């Protein structure tokens, strides 16, 4: 049975498309026809016709930074429940970080994820570890990753501390055209820290994490990349592609902005919790465990710098760093809480509420940040609204107002600081892999 979406706002930044129109999809999942500019697509009696007047059809959202905990910590999340969380948030694909148990640092680990994700409603891209067991001591087999069509490497959560190992990672990743995703953290500065270092941490009696721990690592990496580009590469290998995960400070944004101006292939992402919350939200909350994450929630000034980075295009993507934890790991004193929160179900709503509605970015730019750019950065195929192309769509109601509640989550975990928060904008469903899934 074919599916016919009528009267939707067709919004696809990759095609500079923003107009009211209709899309018909065959039962094979391929787009049969696209109508805009007052044109119409005739419906057949057997078609599944859905009127989307006032709603948006966008390219399927893609989150390039998620943790689904499988293998090894299935009590927090599984590939199946993580995928359910993604669908609830309007995502048709995500990229999975390798810090599972065991770490995904070999083709065997990649094969495990692909085998166990077969039949799930979304696409799962596997990110390989930068180093063996993410210990920062010896490089993982980048050549074998490439042969398994892995697109990126990261030691997320345990940034490479050795400059020599990082230099090798940059060179080898460039040779195999792998994106380097850096969790920028100087562990010598952050050891034992719980939240942003400053007056608020002192007031709460919690050990602080100095904000300089992030830009120090970014500056080191960018210096290495610039040096290798000038003195070592000489066209012998591809230029490194470097991506900063969950950027959180003004200085980090400034470094990325400067590197882009210098012509380096540098991109970065920000999480909804970092452009929405600050350290003061932690201090005023009773349930502080759900405000503990890395990098920590920072000052108002740093949060505002992130918003400006989104406004001027320095920040390329919005990613959730979806990090599920069990109830007992978060409902505890803050200095005992696990780092991280879930984010797939609330990402779109926070983006529209905090950025689009406040005039920081347009809805089209939001789709770029949530879909077009993450796919481009990861080296994935661009989604186009054209006949013959595979339909990969997210259905959005940008005006829907809703209160975040437990019933909204597909995730196995509930560790969010946004429970009870009023948001505007919500995914109503997805069309992907020849299947329509509506909320």
UniProtKB/Swiss-Prot annotation:
Which GO BP terms, alphabetically?
'de novo' UMP biosynthetic process; purine nucleobase catabolic process
Q: What are the positions of the active site?
A: 321
An example of a Gene Ontology cellular component annotation for this protein is: cytoplasm
| Pathway of action | Pyrimidine metabolism; UMP biosynthesis via de novo pathway; (S)-dihydroorotate from bicarbonate: step 3/3
The annotation note on the cofactor reads: Binds 2 Zn(2+) ions per subunit.
- Molecular-function annotations in GO: allantoinase activity; dihydroorotase activity; zinc ion binding
Q: Which UniProt keywords apply?
A: Hydrolase, Metal-binding, Pyrimidine biosynthesis, Zinc
Q: Which major enzyme category is it?
A: hydrolase
Chemical reaction(s) catalysed: (S)-dihydroorotate + H2O = N-carbamoyl-L-aspartate + H(+)
Q: What is its EC number?
A: 3.5.2.3
Give cofactor(s), names only: Zn(2+)
- Binding-site residues for Zn(2+) 1, renumbered to this chain: 65, 67, 156, 321
Kindly list the positions annotated as binding Zn(2+) 2.
156, 183, 246
Enumerate the PROSITE patterns for this protein: DIHYDROOROTASE_2 (PS00483)
InterPro entries, per this entry? Amidohydro-rel, DHOase, DHOase/Allantoinase_Hydrolase, Dihydroorotase_CS, Metal-dep_hydrolase_composite, Metal_Hydrolase
Binding-site residues for substrate, renumbered to this chain: 67-69, 99, 325, 339-340
Protein task: Catalyzes the reversible cyclization of carbamoyl aspartate to dihydroorotate.
| UniProt record similarity statement | Belongs to the metallo-dependent hydrolases superfamily. DHOase family. Class I DHOase subfamily.
The name on file for this protein is Dihydroorotase
